[in-house]
Swiss-Prot record:
Source domain of life: Eukaryota
Signal peptide annotation: none
Family membership: Belongs to the lin-8 family.
Species in which this protein is naturally found: Caenorhabditis elegans
Gene that this sequence comes from: lin-8
PANTHER family: ARID DOMAIN-CONTAINING PROTEIN-RELATED (PTHR32020:SF3), LIN-8 DOMAIN CONTAINING-RELATED (PTHR32020)
Location relative to the cell: Nucleus
UniProt protein name: Protein lin-8
Amino acid sequence: MSKIKTHSTGSKRTVPFYKLPPPVPLPPLPPPDPTRYFSTEKYIALSKDEKFKFDDYDVNDETLKKVVLNEIGKCPDIWSSRSQAAIMEHYPIVATETYRRTGLLLSIKSLKQIYKCGKDNLRNRLRVAIVSKRLTPAQVEAYMWRWEFYGFIRYYRDYTQRWEADLLKDLDVVLGLEARRASKNMEKVDSGELMEPMEPMDSTMDEMCVEEEPYEETGSNWSDPAPEPSQSKSQSPEAKYPQAYLLPEADEVYNPDDFYQEEHESASNAMYRIAFSQQYGGGGSPAVQKPVTFSAQPAPAPVREAPSPVVENVSSSSFTPKPPAMINNFGEEMNQITYQAIRIAREQPERLKLLRKALFDVVLAFDQKEYADVGDLYRDLAQKNS
């Protein structure tokens, strides 16, 4: 596997791809209106007034979402700190600045809803790019620019760097397990225990691709826009993009179309993708990775530089490398959980959505807090869903 996120600039210094200038200018957003003014003190007072009604949040207003994400990006304490006091202190600033730009005065609940949906979609797409598509860092960045909201929440990747590094570590473990399975199967074939080679199992990889449960929005669309009517369905991708930046389509472990409309791109997203190859490719864009194949030889130990430090108030014990044996045992236990979940889903299909949400909520809760016991976890989940 390749290094996670650095780009050589011709000197010893490297810059993460996500911190390079955008390949093309971002779409313009409404500027602040000097005739609109709303003090944060007044906003805080209204927030405490139960009778005051804030403006409704239109889940289909994409410009509003982008403005909110853009304003949150100007308040690092919201996205780089786990201090709830610091976070809540800055939301009134985001609300009043959003009002100056859109004329809409949103509640803190609506602002947090927009922010959570943006973060969840960002992580989902990163997981698809890193784990399912197994792209290089440059290809991950090009892939992310296909999403029209990426430029307005790109800053959050400062916070996801450790998480992205952990994804790659887990991927290395899975690839090593698959290679060892293939090696053992070949040994059994050679000894006559098996009549023909068995293909590597992909179940462990599938488990790694569980999507985060987004904040539910009726009618909301955070997906890539649908294709323009003039675009021919028979047009080949090669006619639109440089060959070096065509994303792999065959032999994918995970199909992102189950969650997003990724197979189509608007003209603006195509422009982002082409411009990225021209600006960041340096005349020789990294080649698209071929689907991973395995020989009978054990996989070599992966070598990767440690991720660069990020501003994050998290105990270092959270990122202590786990012994391989412990991870292997956990993987086997997850196989059993997956089997039982699928069995229940088949027996009770009408409760599939509820089952999926429950599983996501439990797993993703550990991204938000370091739990000492199961009781705390269940209390938080009960409060969240009450």
